[in-house]
Amino acid sequence: MNSHEILLILAFFALVLVPAPFLGRYCFKVMEGQRNLLSAPLAPLERVCYRLFGVDPASEQDWKTYTLALLAFNLAGLVLLFSILMLQGSLPLNPQHLPGLEWTLAFNTAVSFVTNTNWQAYSGEASLSYFSQMVGLTVQNFVSAAVGLCVLVALARGISRRSTRQLGNFWVDLTRGTLYVLLPLCLLLALLLVWQGVPQTFFDYVHATTLQGAEQTIPLGPAASQIAIKQLGTNGGGFFGVNSTHPFENPSAWSNLFEVASIILIPAALVFTFGHYVKDLRQSRAILGCMLLLFCLGLGLSLWAEYQPNPALAQLPIEQGAPMEGKESRFGTAASMLWAITTTAASNGSVNAMHDSLSPLGGMLPLLNMMLGEVIFGGVGAGLYGMLLFVLIAVFLAGLMVGRTPEYLGKKLEAKEVRLLVFTLLVMPVGVLVLGAIAASLPGPASAVTNPGPHGFSQLLYAYTSGSANNGSAFAGFGANTPFHNLMIGLAMLIGRFGYILPILAIAGSLAAKKASPVGPNSFPTHGPLFVSLLTVTILLVGGLTFLPTLALGPIAEQLSLGF
């Protein structure tokens, strides 16, 4: 690594960690309806939204009502987006006269964006009109991120409140998260991207003649606005087919830095938001420390793996540097691996290099990030509520080891909460191992892999892991656009999203109804280095050990076949 690459990584951490505490406090004020920096310009618009949709901002909901409102909203969004994609050919802002999508692809895409996954079995510039990109996908990018924020806030209230059945109002939380948090940040990032050269236009595609005399079509469109929310909302779906490797999505080193840092900006800030809810920022620092430890470990190992020469070519009389296949030469290895680890540590899925071309170990680390449940920062809201599940599991295990009733911040964890926690541990294995095994065992679906041997298995494993983890990145050699995979990966995305949300809201409701006992000297501290170590080990063992056999059949076997 040279000095420029080291400076890039340091700048990345600075852009994320310096504003995170301030943004976290701002998010707390917003979600609790306190006066904040943008109250003056946005509060009147917020009140208009409530009047327009008949919402009483003073009323609150219990966990069941909150859950029903969330499910109804997501179902309506799914039906609306599916209809837009099917009827695309008859809708406006379609200068290329693109037809509607085939129904299984439309279903897969609608589920993908509603669940904040943004798995793309299509190429945006060749398949979707401007209307579908803006009114369909971009809207869901905003609201799916806001839904994740709502679930996190409900869980934080459940942990911090006492002897109540109320978790807040879903419609109020959704409005505030979108209006005060996502829209202002996306406006700022979109302007920065336009400054760097990302297109934001309704003009038709440009037809040009190259120097060799060949005809070329240059796609345009309102890209900057969608790219801003796809990064900040941890959505990840690209306006163009090759995502942020495309020079129109990511034209410069500055745009690359802005985009990769924005992936985990809000997830990092929400760690501090949680600290404000429980009135103990030490909890935030402990959770953030665990996240950073796992993140830096993955980044360091991936950089080491990608800077190694290919062992299969070691006997040849050639000088090898870091392999550059699948990487943008304008960014290089360090920027590519920083993005790969960041996009899979969060549930983002955007890419600035092709993960299918990484070394076996370099490709395994993004895969492992997803298998851990996207808790290393994770998605907007989704990452922290996933991490809090592991916090509760770690507290439960600590209670078993010392023979005490486990409790977290004064709230006792009883049989009901533990059963729900165990249920969430089964979500990823069902999506990855069960659905993936069905796909691998049938000859038709298995033909979607384009490589023989362990790497072909890794392609299929990555696809179903990405869908179940609501990430959306891919080993792009996998032929995903078939009716079977469209439906099965769509099912995996639904399981991965709502299989977590439903038990989390139930846990939040149960904890909110409990009384909190004062934290005393006999309580297990959840803010020191000992707990950070216990939490890290819990994530690696409980979250990662489940998938070790599948990793052995895929990337580990591929690495051993090349020579270590």
From Swiss-Prot:
Gene Ontology terms, cellular component aspect? plasma membrane
Kindly indicate whether the keyword Membrane belongs to this entry: yes
One Pfam family here: KdpA
Q: Which GO terms describe its biological process?
A: potassium ion transmembrane transport
Protein origin, superkingdom: Bacteria
Q: Which UniProt keywords apply?
A: Cell inner membrane, Cell membrane, Ion transport, Membrane, Potassium, Potassium transport, Transmembrane, Transmembrane helix, Transport
* Transmembrane regions listed in the UniProt entry: 4-24, 67-87, 135-155, 179-199, 258-278, 286-306, 376-396, 420-440, 487-507, 528-548
What is its subcellular localisation?
A: Cell inner membrane
GO MF terms, alphabetically ordered:
P-type potassium transmembrane transporter activity; potassium ion binding
Q: Which InterPro entries match?
A: KdpA
| Entry keyword annotation includes Membrane | yes
Q: How does it sit in the membrane?
A: Multi-pass membrane protein
The entry's function note states: Part of the high-affinity ATP-driven potassium transport (or Kdp) system, which catalyzes the hydrolysis of ATP coupled with the electrogenic transport of potassium into the cytoplasm. This subunit binds the periplasmic potassium ions and delivers the ions to the membrane domain of KdpB through an intramembrane tunnel.
Subunit = The system is composed of three essential subunits: KdpA, KdpB and KdpC.
Belongs to which family? Belongs to the KdpA family.
- Please report the name of this protein according to its UniProt entry: Potassium-transporting ATPase potassium-binding subunit
